[in-house]
């Protein structure tokens, strides 16, 4: 059966109160830490041409013939190790961030807003949340991917999906996007404060590892600014913490496949620090605003094991910003700046519009 050209939308009415929407978009998570739940999630994720840039036919054969028959079970074990009674950490943190953001914006005097969150892969989907926002009367929409550093495989694909959904609306809202916030002063200050807070409970480390999610190296060579933006975030964070160049290192994690990715690899950095008998290492992941599999399992568990098993001393993982009040305040500042000129929509405007329309014979 052919898919309808347009999505179902509420009937147009002159008397509805128009709102401005803010949609936070994160990567996503499976519905459960099981192989059954991981298979459709991984299929959606790894079928994205923004994520895997190789010819479609050979990749389809590899994905469906090999990866989806082996990786779901392996990944399920990793997810199970971080899953909480309430569910996926990433989902919980993103949901809380949206709720806290709405409250913070309200304290700034921005009340006529619909603030929500969606996932690029998995649930809640971008399509379902944009549909809900349209039902709430959203006619101006700010899309904010929760990736501080722009990359085609993260920020761009989130916006791709949002635009795909918007292209299927008859009554399309005005749209703005937040491309990145890697050098936003509030974001950097929140990161620095999070690290200083951690250091209050113990000695400063001999080395601070700033671990960012990796991407294939060829993407940098083809114009993706991600590597540069990670380096700038790291430099600004080091300056805020007054660190010398020998006191920190910027590295990249989560390599997938055999292609060369951005270097140095976090796993190799931790191994080398262990072999050097480094007494204390702290790891922070500035590219993630909410703790997830890549931070809680790959770094806090696997990274720790790598460092200790190669002779390292004390390993400490510094949590992501999550629900930190300073981070929520800085996020609200980013939103407010990008909503400039949009928040003047008033309920009275819709009432006046409806009255005038009815005078001219409108029935709704």
From Swiss-Prot:
Pfam families given in the database record: Ferrochelatase
A GO term from the CC aspect: cytoplasm
Annotated PROSITE patterns: FERROCHELATASE
Gene3D superfamilies in the record: 3.40.50.1400
Keyword RNA-binding (UniProt): no
Enzyme class: lyase
The enzyme's E.C. designation: 4.98.1.1
Subcellular location: Cytoplasm
GO biological process: heme biosynthetic process
Single GO molecular function: ferrochelatase activity
SUPFAM superfamilies, per the entry: Chelatase (SSF53800)
InterPro entries reported in the protein's UniProt record: Ferrochelatase (IPR001015), Ferrochelatase_AS (IPR019772), Ferrochelatase_C (IPR033644), Ferrochelatase_N (IPR033659)
Keywords, comma-separated and alphabetical: Cytoplasm, Heme biosynthesis, Iron, Lyase, Metal-binding, Porphyrin biosynthesis
Residue numbers binding Fe cation: 213, 294
NCBIfam families: hemH (TIGR00109)
Alphabetical list of HAMAP family matching this protein: Ferrochelatase
PANTHER family: FERROCHELATASE, FERROCHELATASE, MITOCHONDRIAL
Family recorded in the similarity comment: Belongs to the ferrochelatase family.
Function recorded in the entry: Catalyzes the ferrous insertion into protoporphyrin IX.
Protein name in the entry: Ferrochelatase
Source organism of the structure: Chromobacterium violaceum (strain ATCC 12472 / DSM 30191 / JCM 1249 / CCUG 213 / NBRC 12614 / NCIMB 9131 / NCTC 9757 / MK)
């Amino acid at each position: 059966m052919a898919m309808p050209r347009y999505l179902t939308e509420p009937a147009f009415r002159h008397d509805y109160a128009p709102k401005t929407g803010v949609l936070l978009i994160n990567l996503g998570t499976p519905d459960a830490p099981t192989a059954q739940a991981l298979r459709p999630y991984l299929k959606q994720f790894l079928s994205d041409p923004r994520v895997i840039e190789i010819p479609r036919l050979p990749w389809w054969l590899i994905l469906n013939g090999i990866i989806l028959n082996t990786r779901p079970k392996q990944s399920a074990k990793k997810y199970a190790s971080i899953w909480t009674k309430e569910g996926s950490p990433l989902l919980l943190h993103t949901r809380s961030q949206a709720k806290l953001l709405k409250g913070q914006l309200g304290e700034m005097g921005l009340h006529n807003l619909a603030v929500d969150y969606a996932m690029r892969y998995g649930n809640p989907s971008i399509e379902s949340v944009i549909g809900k926002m349209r039902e709430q009367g959203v006619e101006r929409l700010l899309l904010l991917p929760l990736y501080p550093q722009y990359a085609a495989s993260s920020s761009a694909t989130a916006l791709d999906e949002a635009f795909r959904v918007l292209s299927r609306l008859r009554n399309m809202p005005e749209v703005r996007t937040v491309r990145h916030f890697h050098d936003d002063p509030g974001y950097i200050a929140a990161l620095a404060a999070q690290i200083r807070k951690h250091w209050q409970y113990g000695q400063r480390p001999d080395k601070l590892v700033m671990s960012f999610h990796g991407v294939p190296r060829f993407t940098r060579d083809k114009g993706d600014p991600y590597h540069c933006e990670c380096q700038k975030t790291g430099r600004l964070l080091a300056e805020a913490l007054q660190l010398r160049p020998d006191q920190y290192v910027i590295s990249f994690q989560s390599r997938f496949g055999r292609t060369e990715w951005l270097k140095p690899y976090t796993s190799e950095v931790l191994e080398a620090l262990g072999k050097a008998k480094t007494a204390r290492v702290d790891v922070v992941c500035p590219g993630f605003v909410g703790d997830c599999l890549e931070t809680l399992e790959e770094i806090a568990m696997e990274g720790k094991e790598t460092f200790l098993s190669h002779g390292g001393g004390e390993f400490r993982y510094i949590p992501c910003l999550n629900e930190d009040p300073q981070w929520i305040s800085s996020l609200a500042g980013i939103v407010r700046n990008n909503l400039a000129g949009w928040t003047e929509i008033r309920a009275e405007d819709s009432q006046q519009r409806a009255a005038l329309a009815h005078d001219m014979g409108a029935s709704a």
